[in-house]
């Protein structure tokens, strides 16, 4: 058994059942080993950003790391934007990055690079496995690192001769680590703040915005009168009818300042004190008042559900009913296409237990409120801000949840970064409907031009934000990648085609001209 097979058997034995891959020459022994080992699903991506973004989506919906297979340093670099997003979302993944044979490195071949140096800024654990007999043990360490709560990025570098030489067989992987128990002192401090009567907000993310966490937080809010707010972007929010609703901190600085004005205390549950996404002239970086104090109830690596249970007990909220959403779904939007009408129709048509991958950008800013009373669903957001995460994320979520409908809400400019994900969706037959908002512009940047005080843009500036000339034919592009679809220009057309996509097994794309 060579080193590559030893590694694959270790991955499968350690619960890593999916490998999103874009291999090259140095990874051929790993690819060959996949044929000899049962239990590993291999999913090909035509660009490394699709591979790493899919691993992020897979972890968010399965709580289990996938492996990625990347080709040397340039392959890793091509995938780094979505590794950055996964890191910010606290998703676990095991990156297997091929390298030249150890004896070949001295010759500085064209693809040679400092892979460890490239990996380290966005990895919690990095190692180059020195020989075939070490690779299985190193693979076990990588899996253990990726499974550390709440999820970590592990990067294992696999030299070609480590893969092809005789290995030592698979290694055992230790059981997954459990979250750190919450601090009793932190719980008592939060309870004291809630009893003080001063303006207080609980800022939630992570497990706290999943169904169980929101139910507990809702009980606490009902008992104490505190406000519940989620971070502006969250890895996975469970929402819809029968669940506790939570608003998000707005992206726009002035709006966020209004939401947080007058606060004296923020209780942090998996979150950190809120700051602006970017710096803007004459606007603060901190979104909270200067005299507002932060109190950590639970860090990201701590058991947030246990912390909320303890706080619920401490404030006497255990028997309080959680304030769940019980309104009817919104009615279908009609007439001209607007953000509000789209949000209403999405909320009306979204199927039970759907997964929404949201990279709708400017068009989608109004979607959260009208989908509040939709059927129960999970909402996945971009935690790292690097665009092109939506199509890969939706792909990984669909691999993780084959029995659930995945809906991608997708801006056109961002989609062009990772459009290759459509091909993977078609090849794998993933049950995924993409709603592509085609405003033929980097529309968000038009607002940013004004926000940063850049003055009145001229022709050259506006050309940098324009995605027309030529217009992208999204239906034709999707068809060329194996995904059927339709273009719509009014709400009646959208309602019909979105419903058609939801009813169609496999991938489907609705281009919405906005």
Regions found by a protein language model. Give the residues of each.
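Thiamine diphosphate
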Residues: 96, 104-111, 223, 366-514
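Short, small-residue-rich loop/turn micro-motifs
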Residues: 23, 97, 160, 232, ...
């Amino acid at each position: 058994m060579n080193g590559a097979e030893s590694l694959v058997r270790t991955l499968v034995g350690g619960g890593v059942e999916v490998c999103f891959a874009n291999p090259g020459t140095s990874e051929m022994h790993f690819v060959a080993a996949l044929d000899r080992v049962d239990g590993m699903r291999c999913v090909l991506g035509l660009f490394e950003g699709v591979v790493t973004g899919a691993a992020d989506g897979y972890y968010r919906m399965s709580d289990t790391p996938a492996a990625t297979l990347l080709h040397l340093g340039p392959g890793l670099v091509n995938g780094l934007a979505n590794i950055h997003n996964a890191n910010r979302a606290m998703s676990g993944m095991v990156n297997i990055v091929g390298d030249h044979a150890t004896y070949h490195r001295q010759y500085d071949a064209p693809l040679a690079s400092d892979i460890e140096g490239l990996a380290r800024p966005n990895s919690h654990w990095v190692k180059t496995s020195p020989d075939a007999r070490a690779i299985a043990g190193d693979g076990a360490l990588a899996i253990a690192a990726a499974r550390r709560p709440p999820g970590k990025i592990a990067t294992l570098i696999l030299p070609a001769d480590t893969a092809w030489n005789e290995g030592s067989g698979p290694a055992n992987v230790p059981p997954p680590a459990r979250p750190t128990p919450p601090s009793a002192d932190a719980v008592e401090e939060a309870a004291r703040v809630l009893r003080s009567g001063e303006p207080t907000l609980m800022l939630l993310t992570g497990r706290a915005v999943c169904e169980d966490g929101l139910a507990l937080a809702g009980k606490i809010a009902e008992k104490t009168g505190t406000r519940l707010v989620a971070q502006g972007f969250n890895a996975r929010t469970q929402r819809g009818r029968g669940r506790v609703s939570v608003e998000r901190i707005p992206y726009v600085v002035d709006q966020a300042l209004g939401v947080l004005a007058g606060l004296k205390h923020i209780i942090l549950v998996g979150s950190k004190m809120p700051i602006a996404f970017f710096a803007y002239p004459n606007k603060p970086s901190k979104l909270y008042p200067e005299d507002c104090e932060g109190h950590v109830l639970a860090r990201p690596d701590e058991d947030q559900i246990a912390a909320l249970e303890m706080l619920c007990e401490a404030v006497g909220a255990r028997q309080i009913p959680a304030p769940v959403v019980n309104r009817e779904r919104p009615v279908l939007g009609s007439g001209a296409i607007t953000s509000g009408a789209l949000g209403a129709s999405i909320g009306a048509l979204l199927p039970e237990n759907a997964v929404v991958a949201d990279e709708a950008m400017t068009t989608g800013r109004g979607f959260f409120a009208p989908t509040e009373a939709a059927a129960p669903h999970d909402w996945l957001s971009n935690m790292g801000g690097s665009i092109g995460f939506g199509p890969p994320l939706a792909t990984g979520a669909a691999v993780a949840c084959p029995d659930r409908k995945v809906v991608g809400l997708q801006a056109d400019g961002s989609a062009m970064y990772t459009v290759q994900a459509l091909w993977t969706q078609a090849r794998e037959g993933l049950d995924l409907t993409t709603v592509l908002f085609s405003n033929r512009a980097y529309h968000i940047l038009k607002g940013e031009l004004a926000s940063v005080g850049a003055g009145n843009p001229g022709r050259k500036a506006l050309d940098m934000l324009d995605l027309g000339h030529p217009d992208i034919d999204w239906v034709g592009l999707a068809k060329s990648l194996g995904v059927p679809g339709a273009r719509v220009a009014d709400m009646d057309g959208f309602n019909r085609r979105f419903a058609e996509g939801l009813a169609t097994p496999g991938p489907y794309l609705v281009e919405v001209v906005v």
